[in-house]
């Protein structure tokens, strides 16, 4: 939440809130409670209620290197016949006023080599669908083209891939790659919040409606 202190003030039953991306903060918090190491004041990314009843806030946690975040889908049987969610990037460069993602404008990526290696695990397990949760997958056109070509070349005839994209960002080369894919190999989800240009201006959303 963007207003962690405010939530603690109105919710006395809550003892604390993790802010931002939680991997590092959560690990340190678990270590603190289980092993008794350190103190809450030494864990970045926390807003918490102290023993004195006052609300304390530590500094923001550093953004993690996405390649260091563990891959959770190690056992193929655990996700057999399931939809799996996969994250190859974090962040958003846009500044839509209604979206918390606009606070952090930096976009970070998991390395392409690692992404392909992990997607291959899903392909070998023949999972029905891999759903990318990247906020706007086709921001980086070179990366988009490379991965879509790789997916087309490694199609197992079963698995399909779902992407959230900016339709107005699609290029002719990306469309050409899609045209040569097996029907249903990929799904594209397009968020069209409005078709009114005045609305876009009010919410600071960028979109080329003519495209």
Task: Give, region by region, the residue ranges found by the protein language model.
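Glycine-rich beta-alpha loop elements in corrinoid/cobalamin-binding modules
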Residues: 1-59
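A generic "binding-loop/recognition-motif" signal
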Residues: 22, 62, 92
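A generic structural signal for short, non-catalytic loop/turn and secondary-structure boundary residues
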Residues: 39-41, 62, 79, 156
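A short, sequence-level motif marking secondary-structure junctions
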Residues: 60-66
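Radical SAM [4Fe-4S] cluster-binding motif and immediate context
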Residues: 67-211
């Amino acid at each position: 939440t963007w207003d962690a202190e405010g939530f603690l003030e109105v919710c006395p039953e809550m003892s604390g809130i993790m802010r931002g991306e939680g991997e590092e903060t959560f690990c340190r918090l678990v270590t603190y409670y289980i092993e008794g190491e350190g103190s809450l004041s030494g864990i970045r990314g926390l807003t918490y209620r102290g023993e004195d009843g006052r609300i304390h806030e530590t500094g923001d946690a550093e953004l993690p290197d996405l390649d260091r975040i563990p891959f959770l889908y190690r056992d193929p049987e655990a996700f057999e016949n399931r939809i799996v969610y996969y994250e190859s990037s974090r962040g958003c460069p846009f500044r839509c006023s209604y979206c918390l993602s606009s606070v952090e404008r930096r976009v970070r990526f998991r390395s392409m080599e690692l992404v392909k290696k992990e997607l291959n695990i899903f392909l070998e397990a023949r999972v029905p669908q891999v759903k990318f949760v990247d906020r706007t997958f086709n921001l980086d056109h070179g990366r988009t083209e490379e991965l879509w070509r790789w997916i087309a070349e490694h199609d197992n005839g079963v698995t399909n891939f779902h992407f959230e994209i900016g339709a107005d960002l699609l290029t002719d080369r990306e469309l050409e790659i899609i045209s040569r894919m097996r029907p249903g190999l990929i799904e594209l989800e397009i968020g069209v919040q409005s078709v009114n240009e005045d609305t876009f201006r009010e919410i600071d959303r960028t979109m080329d409606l003519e495209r």
